[in-house]
């Protein structure tokens, strides 16, 4: 089967936005106008095509990036293939956004014309900046009360520190919003608001003529800056033709020198078709962006893979989803080469082979089986056993590891238990499935309490995990309060000589151990034997190590696991008949309990590396608040038009921080935190913790 669409006619893009900027409605309209959807699903009715998980429909927010393939005939009559990835707009799902940005070639940033640039827009914009994703801006909801296009454009500069290139002006606003002025063609486009109606093209209204001339002048000035020859011609008084202007705008957009700004209202069906034309005109195809970098597995040298069907196959798994009909689906972006159903691929990250079963083209939640896929495609693969998010799949003869995605460590933990015994096994299966889908979600078992602990990026993140468990896996669970993972250690050296004796009837038990316990730098446990002359026979020494390790999980102060302990067995004694591995295990356990107390046990707490990105106005408040949380400020730096505050703060003092920061900065500052190291707890705080856990 040959390629149906040339790679230069592909557009892989996503729509990124603040939580209520109208992203799902916009995606629905795009799917409708590109002919895939016959009935538009309105988000406020809970019936949208892209939001295919129940919770998304209930909450009216988009959680999972569903990838959709659709087609659009541009102004030139050529059909283009669009692969659209819907991205979430809530701060707890930024991991989803990172994943989709990683595999996109371009993006549309939606703004609410009333609110302009909102906090989550800033966060997502920064993430897109990290991956240098070319972006256009669409000022949506122009029909809303308080809609202000010019203020939104100003905020793109002041809040995002980005260069806005205005390519359309609105005709009217709020209830009087009729359409747009196309500044390239210098024509007015108006819509009557009915679904699917084409634009009526006419002359620019007389009251907008002057403004349109002024903005076209600015547009040309910014566009010619990206090309030396065009700049020289312009300075000599030669204006670019409309065709040249489009290619200059495309060049500047692809090189991320500026961002074209359009406007409209998706809900009222005004401005959607010109946006689709702009995707074709201005956003890159897979061959317009730099080739993806990777590591050649054989030589360990850096290499690149060109977006070509003739290059060796390489693809990146960026999402795993559970599909009720197909089972587990792995979404992949093919960067180079082509792939047939049924072939064997290598997962170079896991060092495992994968056989390719079904290959699907996804349309939101319907699917189409395909035999072959090509460079630039986004496909869903069924039946992969080993592959998880961020893994590379490639030609086994030309192995490569593409750039890995980086996922932050989870920062919040809660205990979870099934409501009934019958749910115990189902809960384990459900949690493991969900953890395979989402690398920012972890599951572990607490050895002391036997409880299952789940960890994630925030409270909403874990709420939704629990909710999905109930809906998709029919598991009801009780959820505890968020907890801090404390640890214990020792501060000085202690030598313990302990004898374990049991000789009352039957087989006796005897073991004597002399052990030195001392602190060491690392977090692990080190065991060493310095026995000479057979004071403890060789076969019993592993029993000593096993005995100490078995009680390292529960320290003497509050029962937390111990870190950074070294134990050296220096002497001992045994009995020919009564000694055994078990007897030495018991003796070592008791010796450790004595030793931990005598070696000055102390409580340790997790210290988080916190980064707050805030507008300058709130820097003082942010620093003051972090200090009040026992935080150590390690520095501040400018990033664009914002300030980054770096600090080390105990996790125990960070609960509820998101709400404090939100209210302190009117929702404009964001923070990320990840575990850095353990540190001794101040004595006053340690006493409270011991009381609580004793």
UniProtKB/Swiss-Prot annotation:
One BP annotation, GO: ribosome disassembly
Keywords: Cytoplasm, Elongation factor, GTP-binding, Nucleotide-binding, Protein biosynthesis
GO CC annotation, single: cytoplasm
Lineage: Bacteria, Pseudomonadati, Pseudomonadota, Alphaproteobacteria, Hyphomicrobiales
Species this chain originates from: Bartonella tribocorum (strain CIP 105476 / IBS 506)
Main subcellular localisation: cytoplasm
HAMAP family xrefs: EF_G_EF_2_B (MF_00054_B)
Domain tr-type G: start-end pairs: 8-287
Residues that coordinate or bind GTP: 17-24, 86-90, 140-143
Location(s) in or outside the cell: Cytoplasm
Family: Belongs to the TRAFAC class translation factor GTPase superfamily. Classic translation factor GTPase family. EF-G/EF-2 subfamily.
Function field: Catalyzes the GTP-dependent ribosomal translocation step during translation elongation. During this step, the ribosome changes from the pre-translocational (PRE) to the post-translocational (POST) state as the newly formed A-site-bound peptidyl-tRNA and P-site-bound deacylated tRNA move to the P and E sites, respectively. Catalyzes the coordinated movement of the two tRNA molecules, the mRNA and conformational changes in the ribosome.
GO function term, MF aspect, one: guanosine tetraphosphate binding
Domain of life where this protein originates: Bacteria
Protein name, as recorded: Elongation factor G
């Amino acid at each position: 089967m040959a390629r149906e669409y040339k790679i230069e006619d592909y557009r892989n893009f996503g729509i990124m936005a603040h939580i209520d900027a109208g992203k799902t409605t916009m995606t629905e309209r795009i799917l409708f106008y590109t002919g895939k959807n016959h009935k538009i699903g309105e988000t406020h009715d809970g019936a949208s095509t892209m939001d295919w998980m129940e919770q998304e429909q209930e909450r009216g927010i988009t959680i999972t990036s569903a990838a959709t393939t659709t087609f659009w005939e541009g102004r030139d009559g050529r059909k283009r293939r669009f692969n659209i990835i819907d991205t979430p707009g809530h701060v707890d799902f930024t991991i989803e956004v990172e994943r989709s940005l990683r595999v996109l070639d371009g993006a549309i940033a939606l703004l609410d014309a009333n609110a302009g640039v909102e906090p989550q827009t800033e966060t997502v914009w920064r993430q897109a900046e990290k991956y240098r994703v070319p972006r256009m801006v669409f000022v949506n909801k122009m029909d809303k009360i308080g809609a202000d296009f010019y203020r939104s454009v100003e905020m793109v500069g002041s809040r995002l520190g980005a260069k806005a290139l205005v390519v359309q002006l609105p005709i009217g606003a709020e209830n009087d919003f009729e359409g747009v002025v196309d500044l390239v063609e210098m024509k007015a486009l108006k819509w009557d608001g009915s679904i699917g109606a084409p634009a009526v093209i006419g002359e620019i209204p007389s009251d907008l003529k002057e403004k349109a001339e002024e903005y076209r002048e600015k547009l040309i000035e910014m566009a010619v800056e990206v090309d030396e020859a065009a700049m020289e011609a312009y300075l000599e008084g030669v204006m670019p033709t409309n065709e040249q202007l489009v290619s200059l705008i495309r060049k500047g957009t692809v090189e991320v020198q500026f961002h074209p700004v359009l406007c409209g209202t998706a809900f009222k069906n005004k401005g959607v078709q010109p946006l689709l034309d702009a995707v074709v005109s201005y956003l890159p195809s897979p061959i317009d962006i730099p080739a993806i970098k990777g590591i050649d597995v054989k030589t360990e040298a850096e290499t690149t893979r060109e977006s070509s069907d003739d290059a060796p196959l390489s693809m990146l798994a960026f999402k795993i989803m559970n599909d009720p009909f197909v089972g587990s689906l792995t979404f992949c972006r093919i960067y180079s080469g082509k792939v047939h159903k049924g072939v064997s691929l290598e997962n170079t990250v896991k060092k495992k082979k994968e056989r390719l079963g079904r290959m699907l083209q996804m349309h939101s939640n319907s699917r189409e089986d395909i035999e072959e896929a090509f460079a630039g495609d986004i496909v869903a693969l069924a039946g992969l056993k080993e592959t998880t998010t961020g893994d590379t799949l490639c030609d086994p003869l030309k192995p490569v590891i593409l750039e890995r995605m980086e996922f932050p460590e989870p920062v919040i933990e809660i205990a979870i238990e099934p409501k009934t015994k019958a749910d115990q096994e189902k809960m384990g299966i459900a949690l493991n499935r969900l953890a395979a889908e989402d690398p920012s979600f972890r599951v572990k078992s607490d050895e002391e309490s036997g409880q299952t602990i789940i960890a994630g990026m925030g409270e909403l993140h874990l709420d939704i995990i629990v909710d999905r468990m109930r809906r998709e896996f029919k598991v009801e669970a009780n959820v505890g309060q968020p907890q801090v993972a404390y640890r214990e250690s020792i501060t000085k050296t202690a030598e313990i000589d302990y004898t374990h004796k049991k000789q009352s009837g039957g087989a006796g038990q005897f073991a004597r151990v002399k052990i030195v316990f001392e602190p060491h730098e690392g977090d692990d446990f080190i065991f060493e034997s310095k026995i000479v002359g057979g004071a403890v026979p060789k076969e019993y020494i592993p029993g000593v190590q096993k005995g100490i390790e078995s009680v390292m999980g529960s320290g003497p102060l509050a029962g937390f696991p111990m870190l950074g302990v070294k134990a050296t067995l220096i002497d001992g004694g045994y009995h020919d008949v009564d000694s055994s591995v078990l007897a030495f295990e018991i003796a070592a356990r008791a010796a450790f309990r004595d030793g931990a107390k005598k070696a000055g046990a102390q409580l340790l707490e997790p210290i988080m590396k916190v980064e707050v990105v805030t507008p300058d106005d709130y820097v003082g408040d942010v620093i003051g608040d972090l200090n009040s949380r026992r935080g150590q400020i390690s520095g501040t730096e400018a990033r664009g038009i914002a300030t980054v505050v770096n600090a080390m703060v105990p996790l125990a003092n960070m609960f509820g921080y998101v709400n404090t920061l939100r209210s302190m900065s009117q929702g404009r500052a964001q923070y990320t935190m990840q575990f850095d190291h353990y540190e001794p707890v101040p004595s006053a705080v340690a006493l409270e913790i011991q009381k609580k856990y004793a």
